């Protein structure tokens, strides 16, 4: 009997040689996920089983795929089926399961997995833009996002206009009839500004511009990008999806036309695709994503409440905490404000460093959304390359600390923070 390399069946099973079909059908069946709640989708969505009927999703750690004949190889390259594969840079069964699960969680038709969050941001922007285009973006962005906008896109003749993302009038004034794309962070990193996403989407779509949202701080659990009308929702899955500081990843979610059109074409040819191993690690992490993120968000609000008014602090900021200047907007858009808060330590950099060095449980690092609680000094790390004037405009002060809450007991975290602050 001629053997054929397996291809994926959209109904949930790998297509096998004719003699093995009965076993495949017995071990994998079509699942109607309509109406399933988030936690159920995070465990079951996108699963495709091979003829072996494995319970845990399989890791296809392979660069390429086998064809029975030269004619079969030619046919595959001429007309690649939706779930057929030719090379891991173009697609992989494990990666496809991860993409399907993320798209379902986000409420989009499709998704493309990338090597990192910044590969996802770069891929989304480069795939949709050309020389001479105009982009409007919020000015409060992660340092690497600012670099891509100002240095990379600027070098290729794309005009960039940065605005105060919290000011709808500023968006209205900046978006022009020839604006091609709007880019923003739904919750800015690290300043935690909140943008009226639906209003900005309406302004952009009125002139035919695409909207790309970096949703890393919002988290996939509390995301409202699809509901608000964003064309693409971009993630660093390194953060909450992996959630344990193990491996890099990124994801672009959107319509099938955008994802399997310009996005896939750009990324598969420029090498931004995700490793199958990283896809497998993060696919498995999604099973506990809702449980982890909700606990971290609950802890973040508890910490904000506990530190609010501490004499060593100028401010505590968390989107759904009553002291946040955009509290009402944040509460109207999302169930919670994410897993990160910021504090502003009195006494500037010197006092801030003393505070950081006095912490016992918190880890000093530049990542966030880990199971371990992490503290970061943005002015000297993630945003150190920005001119001081730009830091001042954004509100990145010498005393700002980004506090990422992990899965430790909230009482222990609060005690650790208070002890370090009380010593100042």
What are these regions (language model features)?
Residues 32, 42-51, 111-311, 317:
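Conserved PLP-enzyme active-site core in the AAT-like
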Residues 2-15:
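Positively charged N-terminal leader segments that act as targeting/secretion signals
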Residues 24-92, 100:
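N-terminal "arm"/small-domain region of PLP-dependent enzymes with the aminotransferase-like
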Residues 21-29, 150-151, 159-161, 173, ...:
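PLP-dependent enzyme catalytic core of the Aspartate aminotransferase-like
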Residues 315-401, 405:
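Conserved C-terminal alpha-helix-loop-beta "cap" of PLP-dependent enzymes
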Residues 69-119, 144-151:
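Conserved N-terminal alpha-helix of the aminotransferase class I/II PLP-enzyme fold
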Residues 105, 307-311, 359:
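Acidic-histidine catalytic/liganding microenvironments
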Residues 64-65, 254-258, 286, 345-350:
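Short loop segments at secondary-structure junctions
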């Amino acid at each position: 009997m001629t053997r054929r390399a397996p291809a994926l069946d959209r109904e949930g099973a790998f297509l096998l040689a004719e003699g093995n079909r009965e076993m495949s059908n017995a071990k994998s069946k079509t699942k109607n996920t309509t109406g399933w709640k988030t936690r159920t989708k995070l465990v079951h969505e996108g699963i495709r089983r091979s003829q072996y009927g494995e319970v845990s999703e399989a890791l296809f750690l392979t660069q390429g795929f086998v064809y029975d004949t030269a004619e079969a190889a030619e046919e595959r390259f001429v007309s690649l089926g939706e779930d057929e594969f030719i090379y891991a840079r173009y697609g992989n069964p494990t990666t496809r399961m991860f993409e399907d699960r993320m798209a379902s969680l986000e409420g989009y038709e499709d998704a493309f997995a990338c090597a990192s969050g910044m590969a996802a941001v770069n891929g989304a922007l480069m795939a949709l833009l050309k020389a001479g285009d105009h982009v409007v973006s919020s000015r409060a962005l992660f340092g690497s996002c600012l670099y891509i906008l100002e240095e990379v896109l600027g070098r290729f003749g794309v005009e960039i206009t940065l605005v105060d993302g919290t000011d709808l009038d500023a968006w209205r004034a900046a978006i022009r009839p020839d604006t091609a794309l709007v880019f923003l962070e739904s919750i800015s990193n690290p300043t935690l500004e909140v943008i009226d996403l639906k209003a900005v989407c309406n302004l952009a779509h009125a002139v035919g511009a695409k909207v790309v949202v970096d949703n890393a701080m919002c988290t996939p659990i509390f995301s409202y990008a699809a509901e608000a009308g964003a064309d693409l929702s971009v993630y660093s899955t390194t953060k909450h999806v992996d959630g344990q500081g193990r491996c890099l990843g990124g994801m672009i979610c959107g319509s099938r036309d955008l994802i399997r059109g310009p996005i896939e074409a750009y990324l598969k040819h420029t090498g931004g695709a995700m490793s199958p191993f990283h896809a497998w690690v993060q696919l498995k992490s999604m099973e506990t994503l809702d449980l982890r993120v909700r606990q971290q968000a609950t802890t973040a609000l508890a910490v904000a409440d506990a530190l609010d008014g501490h004499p060593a602090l100028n401010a505590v900021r968390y989107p759904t905490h009553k002291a946040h200047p955009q509290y009402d907007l944040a509460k109207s858009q999302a169930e919670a404000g994410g897993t990160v808060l910021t504090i502003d330590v009195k006494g500037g950099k010197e006092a801030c460093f003393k505070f950081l060095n006095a912490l016992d449980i918190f880890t000093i690092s530049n990542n966030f959304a880990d199971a371990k609680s992490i503290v970061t000094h943005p002015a000297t790390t993630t945003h150190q390359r920005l001119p001081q004037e730009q830091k001042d405009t954004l509100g990145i002060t010498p005393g700002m600390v980004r506090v990422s809450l992990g899965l430790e007991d909230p009482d222990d975290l609060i005690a650790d923070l208070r002890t370090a602050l009380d010593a100042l």
